[in-house]
Amino acid sequence: MQTSLTIHDRILRIQTLLEEKKGEDIEVFDLSGRDYIVEKVLIVSAMIGRHSHALLDHLKTELKPQGEIFYATEEESEDWLIADLGDIMIHIFTPNHRKKFNLEEFLNTLIASKA
């Protein structure tokens, strides 16, 4: 089963679920029409490493029964977790790792270069 919601509605649902579990500084990047592997990237900060796993577990628990497919997850480091939903990529960072890797700058540059 796969969800029949639009990508916009799926993003809103993901944001709501992350906010329910105290995910912070949620940003969404629209990469539609760009030379990138997904249409949307969502970045969220977790308070600490264990919180990262709690956020990802909450997403899986709530979204899988609704038809969302998690094609892959990267969970080796609690400082940076990744969930691949096919056309949406979710990055869950601890604040220090989010600042260190500054994925937002890369994504904004990618968006601006194709404007």
Features from the language model and the residues they span:
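Switch/connector loops and helix/strand junctions flanking conserved nucleotide-binding motifs
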Residues: 99-102
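Polybasic/polar functional segments that serve as interface/processing modules
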Residues: 1-38, 47-81, 88, 95-97, ...
